């Protein structure tokens, strides 16, 4: 009997030592209340709503179940099986993770400068709307790309020059064009020759009057002919103007001849 009780006492002492170390490191049991509640806490809990009371009860139940589980583990011997005394750190401050409830949620849509909000919108329909929006976006991008390609094609169009002869034209059209050019040149030359011939006839008709006009030269003025008088010279040495030449008397002789010819015509008549 003495041999069977010794290992049980050693296990119990190890557990007690582990608990003492845990308390020294943490300073308290954390959220473990060991089923003990203060009067002030109960009074505050009574002031809350029904929902708040339910939450407090749930927390108390969880806090009661956790220390009992720890005590069971220590009693069974699951805390430490090795010879070395190693403390097990359990963080009891973290609340239990609650899985999100799958249900309807709020949906906001920004479209055309407007904001639309839908409450309690199912997830399936939201996914369908997202797929439709993606397809519409692809269609809009394709249409923009096609328009840009069309604009580039229009800008690259080469306008043919109608003045230049095209390579696809017939040789007959080119020959006829050359013939028309030759005919136009000949017509221009002929019109120029006619114009010059008329000018010659007019010059011949006006020739005698022009000769008489050019033949009569007026005598030069004395101011232009007289040289400048130098200082110390007398007025006697002033040069006399030159005498007019014989051809200056030609207009008088021509007038006399015309008068005689007019008299002869009168006598004949």
Curated annotation (Swiss-Prot):
Keyword Acetylation: yes
Any one GO CC term of the record: nucleus
Post-translational modification: (Microbial infection) Acetylated by Pseudomonas syringae HopZ1a.
Superkingdom of this protein's organism: Eukaryota
Keyword Manganese attributed: no
GO process terms (BP): defense response; response to jasmonic acid; response to wounding
Entry-linked Pfam families: Jas_motif (PF09425), tify (PF06200)
Residue interval(s) of motif Nuclear localization signal: 187-194
Motif (Jas): 186-210
InterPro entries recorded: CCT_CS, TIFY/JAZ, Tify_dom
Region (Disordered): 160-181, 209-269
Family label: Belongs to the TIFY/JAZ family.
Protein function: Repressor of jasmonate responses.
Protein name stated in the entry: Protein TIFY 11B
């Amino acid at each position: 009997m003495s041999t069977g009780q010794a290992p049980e006492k050693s296990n119990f002492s190890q557990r007690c030592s582990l608990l003492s170390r845990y308390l020294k490191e943490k300073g308290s049991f954390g959220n473990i209340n060991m089923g003990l509640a203060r009067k002030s806490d109960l009074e505050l809990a009574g002031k809350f709503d029904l929902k708040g009371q339910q939450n407090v009860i749930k927390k108390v139940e969880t806090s009661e179940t956790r220390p009992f589980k720890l005590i069971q583990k220590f009693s069974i011997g699951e805390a430490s099986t090795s010879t070395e005394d190693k403390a097990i750190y359990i963080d009891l401050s973290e609340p239990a993770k609650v899985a999100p409830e799958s249900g309807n949620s709020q949906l906001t849509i920004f479209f055309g400068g407007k904001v639309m909000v839908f409450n309690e919108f199912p997830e399936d329909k939201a996914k369908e709307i997202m797929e439709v929006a993606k397809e519409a976006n692809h269609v809009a991008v394709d249409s923009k790309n096609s328009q840009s390609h069309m604009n580039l094609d229009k800008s690259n169009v080469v306008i043919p020059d109608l003045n230049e002869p095209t390579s696809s034209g017939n040789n007959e059209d080119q020959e006829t064009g050359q013939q028309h050019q030759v005919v136009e040149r000949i017509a221009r030359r002929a019109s120029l020759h006619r114009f010059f011939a008329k000018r010659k006839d007019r010059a011949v008709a006006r020739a005698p009057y022009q000769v008489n006009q050019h033949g009569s030269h007026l005598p030069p003025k004395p101011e232009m002919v007289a040289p400048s008088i130098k200082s110390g010279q007398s007025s006697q040495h002033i040069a006399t103007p030159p005498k007019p030449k014989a051809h200056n008397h030609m207009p008088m002789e021509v007038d006399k001849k015309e008068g005689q010819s007019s008299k002869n015509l009168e006598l004949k008549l």
